[in-house]
Amino acid sequence: FFFNDTATTEIYTLSLHDALPICAPVEGIFDDADVVVKGRFVNQRVAGVPMEPNGIIAVPEPGGKLTAWIPSQAPHSVHGEFAGALGMDPADLRVRTAAVGGGFGSKAAFMVEFIIAAKAAQALDRPVKWTETRSENMVAMVQGRAQVQFVELGLKRDGTITALKEHVLGDAGAYPGTGSFLPFFTHTMATGVYNIPKLEFDWKAVLTNTTSIGAYRGAGRPEATQAIERILDMAADELGIDPVEIRRKNLLPKFEAPGMMAGSGLAMYDTGDYEAALDAALAHADYTALRAAQAERRASGATKQLGIGVSVYVEITAPAGMHVEYGAVEVLDDGSVKAYVGTSAHGQGHDTAFSMIVSEILGVPMDKVTLVQSDTALVPRGSGTMGSRSLQTGGSAVYRSSEGVLDKAKQLAAQLLEASPDDIVLGDGGLQVAGVPAKLVAWGELSAKAAGSGIEGLEAGLRHEIDFDGTQSSFPFGAHVAVVEIDTETGRVELVRHVAVDDCGRILNPMLVRGQQHGGIAQGVAQALYEWVQYDADGNPITANLMDYAMPSAAELPSFETYNTETPTHLNPLGAKGIGESGTIGSTPAVQNAVLDALSQFGIKNLDMPASSQRVWAAIQEARG
């Protein structure tokens, strides 16, 4: 059996466990509520569809060694599994990752085909290459979401939330892996940015005859935001309150230091100013004018009606187990710098971001900084790039390593220039005595001196490495406003505007942040309006290529309006939080809320995603009778 549509979501072959009451049942949970609003929400199964499918080039090396080129988000994690599967000494296996055509969480997994290709290469003593076809990728690569949520929200008549109760059914696919615990992340973020005094949450993961579920951009957090943001809109409708005002009434207050406990009790938020993000999004969207335009269309009975959707979110980045990252910085004899890091970029722009960090601290031009990553022979350890963790962990490791190099260089320069280390400052191409530019030692000279100088108290080499430990997760947040236009005669939905205000702490490079926002929003919109992995009555996949799987292109999407607020975290020296998944978390509920807002005049309360033309048209026809 399999999850395929809203009629069959309770059918499954095997439950992995009894429902887990992680938040113990609360006796009389809704006793003080005037109203209890109930909703059943489906987060349909979607595919990551990276531009580059999985593949490997396995190259035998002398002495029984092997080099494997793979498109991975976490080459060091794969390295350990790979060596174990091959029965090799890890020192004899080198895993390398070149430019990767997208990951989105799906390429954090280890593929069994890697073992087959490597074994073939060893047996033939020649390189072996394997690359998935698109159709193979659509059924073999782990997929995402696949949750059904049963949500109850208790409120006072004025819109104040009294309690939240959720039961989540998660489809893990055929083999229990990451998908079997993704509902835990949903639980962690269940109450979102709101003050919810009581929470009761339980979840169950089940096995189905389908492709396994794994991490997909957001991994459990978009599902949490979807549930709370949808039920809030339904509550606003029930109570006759504007969707913005019911949110504003229940937002957690601004806080600037860790200590704000999430309603789940599983997360300690670091910093947040949720109302500021909401206010900024409403201002940029001109919310009042949008409502006026909507009222005009409704009054005129226009065929094309406007819908306005709002969502406010908070998410967890660098989750537990992902706080530590390796970094090293080394100055070479020619004055150039190499930075080593255990993250593994696949489109995020780490070369630019991490070079900026080194350049800022050491005063070396960015074009003289080389980033070394994604190679287990050159970088001794690493946790990879996932969970929006890279800048706050890997970037901080590079930052601290750069500081270590600078401190060592100052001590060396002080001895060479016969000055106090406190008087040594950055100069043009090296270090100098403050106020005396003529007394300067170039970086190349410092490196050469450090290599074999034997100066008392300094180790040889101008290098510093560290395993940075962020100790806790950070919590980015934001607010999105979506505007859709629905043709009530055909059911066609067009996203005409999408405004996003995302807060990822202190921003290092605005252009890189914008890129992450745009990509994430596109994937979030795709889930709301287009994408859906489907199976036929016998469990055969019927969306196994891009002719059948409705992945939008730029032609279906507007130019997103992206902005930021900055609320730095205290958990790392950069003040940075993650940004890679924020777009998917904020956009999906905003777009779905916009669709339901447009359909509310027909009395339609809910509609499962994706809001395809067929579904919207059918809902309108049913409502019209």
Regions found by a protein language model. Give the residues of each.
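Amphipathic, heptad-repeat alpha-helical segments used for oligomerization and assembly
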Residues: 219, 389, 570-583
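N-terminal amphipathic, basic-rich helices that act as targeting or association modules
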Residues: 1, 38-39, 247, 475, ...
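Generic long, charged, amphipathic alpha-helical segments
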Residues: 370-373, 552-576
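Structural alpha/beta core scaffold segments of enzyme domains
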Residues: 1, 14-501, 557, 594-600, ...
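Contiguous domain-boundary segments centered on the initiation and propagation of an alpha-helix
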Residues: 295, 534-552, 556
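Conserved phosphate/anionic-ligand binding catalytic regions in large, soluble enzymes, centered on
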Residues: 104, 108, 224, 350, ...
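Short, highly charged C-terminal tails/helix-capping segments
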Residues: 608-623
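Short, exposed "boundary/linker" segments that immediately precede the start
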Residues: 4-13
